[in-house]
Regions:
Chain A
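A structural signal for small-residue-enriched, beta-sheet-centric alpha/beta enzyme cores
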Residues: 2-100, 107-411
């Protein structure tokens, strides 16, 4: 992990996340890449746990992603093994062999099938996974099951992250108290669909696999698929949601079951919390940017415009420089390829209307917006004036520190 | 123009470009934004000049782009007026009015129709064009026609450029000697389709408008549409090719006329020369990167992969840091959304095969590639192993200087 101090946008502290019934965590230091820190996480899950996953759309997906995509179709999981420091990506047949070996190792210890062991890896691409190191610490990892905290788990999966990321919410399904708790990592190579971003969310709710899959996809779409740090899509992006069923709530029948309303909201809050923490740890980030797009022809078009703004290096550097260069926002809207009529386009920053229906508003004074830009939370609102489509997208600014981190990451 | 020293990748000197029969140039300092430098260029063209243009695909195209797109359909031009410092983009009705006013002013002086006057503007977006300043220097501009050099013309159209860009070639159509000469500007907001990039190329050849249009599009596709600096698409990108016909060669009938072979090659050389100069002046560039993609299912797919690599901030920062982080190249290939089979993928840098058919080659030693990366001209070759499609794409690295320039551009 490069020697970088904590992001100025980091939350003040890691939340006090309660346990999730049925989930037992363990961490270990295998020395895969990093020295003197935990880099392995194992989560054991009880029988009957349902699981859903969303993975990178990269054409060069990592071996663990290929493994998980194949195995999560069962909708079941008994364990989750995660390592940091090595992505096991672009490692050919050996990479697939190493995943199978790891899953089998966990399966034996937990008396389940290898297919029930989900695996995720994050770190350098193209280097073989040093499985012998994992092998050495494996007995200890198994022996420690149940002893690790969420904080330790969140730390073990980090790479260039400057702080561990966790979130939780309590909610109800019917009259049953439910806990939703999650951890995530990610700070660079962050873009939707998805990012070098791993997110693992655990709930004790009882949710059938098909329902869990729908809820998870819809939630990821409004959280991790609405963030970008640098527009680069990783080989390893993984979001996994597991439900242990230990809360014994009445089983919902579909995603539209009214009993799920409170749960879906809690889940979305956990995902948005984790996703925005990833952005707040965006490599070199000094400002957190929320972009609201309204008046698009559809929600999809709105997100397209939002992401075009969020991914523009020129918008992001202007904000880093606290420069109210709103012309670059117009440029980014233009390049989005979404339907746009510049005569109807309005742009605001920090709640101040700068341009309305195709031109700068009369009497616009930059000083108020400049004031807003000196803060660390920046708001951009774009109204396309075409329809009812809307989306909210989050990103961070592009600073010298991003360059420093990424020009020095591997060496 | 921010106080930045000349790009380390700049050519040693501006070429000694000969005159093009029929083209008369003038420059003037209107003080649109910059002080004490020329910011207006006028090129007068003789009757019978044919013209072709390619413009930004931005949904928020500038007023001059809208004007040119409408008027170039005639295939004729009598003048070209260019200003730097203000893009006249997102300026509403007033912007269109200002273009019409400028064109009419030139048309009166040259006794032609306003529709024959092509206009281009580059600079800040969203601020009204200060036409009164142009008005003041206008008589002088007309009076100076024929007195400006290519060097002066190339300098007058620059914004954040650290050096003026020009190129020329001589060739033959039949037995007639032909000159092709061009100037360009651009250094940021550079991406294909196109970039804040203006290119104006002039030839004395006699080419019917329809043929000129085809030749121009094909040439832009293999030059300006194969470069990227920061993936941002400008509101103002313009490439215009004019042919004065003064060389009186036999008129070619189609783009496939054999007499054009030599001319097409010369034209492509001029465009690639200008396009790569734009990349070499990429904001903050310290390394010039040539990416060859082979084995794609089509040339279009190859270009898509090449641009995904060229636009990846993680690839560009790694190269800035002289780090042979080829895993990021694999990541970028994966995110391109072109057809990819990672089992067939090979990656080389500086001619050294690093990964072959889906994994790192046995015995690969990074030190040779590291050596290559210390140079200023970097070569990346990717073979997808799928077909005969190929493309060459150019970009530059992403450095601290990019951030510095763009966080401070406007203020």
């Amino acid at each position: 992990m490069p020697d970088v101090s904590k992001s100025p946008l980091a939350p003040r502290r890691f939340p006090r996340i309660p346990g999730v019934a049925g989930v037992r965590l363990a961490v270990a230091a295998a020395g895969i890449k990093y020295k003197r820190r935990n880099d392995l996480l194992l989560a054991a899950l009880p029988q009957g746990t349902t699981a859903a996953g969303v993975f990178t759309r990269s054409g060069t997906a990592s071996a663990p992603v290929i493994w998980c995509r194949d195995n999560i179709t069962s909708g079941r999981a008994r364990a989750l093994l995660v390592n940091s420091g090595n992505a096991n990506a672009f490692t050919g047949d050996r990479g697939m062999h190493d995943v199978r070996w790891s899953a089998t190792r966990v399966a034996k210890a937990l008396a389940c099938r290898p297919a029930g062991v989900l695996v995720a890896s994050t770190g350098v691409i193209g280097e073989p996974l040093p499985v012998h190191r994992i092998d050495t610490v494996f007995p200890r990892l198994i022996g420690e099951l149940g002893n690790a905290s969420w904080y330790q788990a969140a730390r073990a999966i980090t790479t260039t992250d400057t702080f561990p990321k966790g979130a939780y919410r309590r909610c109800q399904i019917g009259n049953t108290e439910i806990t939703v708790a999650g951890i995530a990592k990610g700070s660079g190579m962050i873009a939707p669909n998805m990012a070098t971003m791993l997110a693992f969310v655990f709930t004790d709710a009882r949710i059938p696999a098909a329902v869990l899959r729908s809820v998870h996809s819809a939630t990821v779409d409004r959280s991790f698929n609405c963030i970008t740090v640098d527009s680069d899509t990783s080989t390893s992006d993984t979001s996994i949601l597991v439900a242990t069923g230990q809360a014994r709530n009445a089983e919902p029948e579909s995603i539209s079951d009214r009993a799920l309303k409170n749960f879906k909201q809690a889940l979305l809050e956990v995902y948005v919390d984790l996703a925005t923490q990833v952005v707040k740890d965006g490599e070199g980030a000094s400002k957190f940017i929320t972009i609201d797009v309204e008046g698009a022809t559809s929600n999809t078009a709105a997100r397209k415009v939002g992401l075009a703004i969020a991914e523009s290096p020129l918008v992001k550097t202007a904000i880093a420089g606290e420069d109210a260069n709103w012309g670059r926002i117009v440029m980014a809207v233009g390049k989005s390829q979404a339907q746009v009529d510049q005569q109807l386009l309005s742009v605001s920053m920090g709640g101040v209307l700068i341009a309305h229906r195709g031109q700068r508003v009369a009497g616009y004074t930059e000083s108020i917006v400049d004031q807003h830009l000196t803060g660390s939370e920046i708001e951009i609102t774009v109204n396309l004036g075409l329809g009812a489509g809307r989306a909210r997208v989050w990103t961070c600014d592009l600073t010298h520190e991003y360059i420093r981190i990424n020009a020095e990451y591997r060496t």
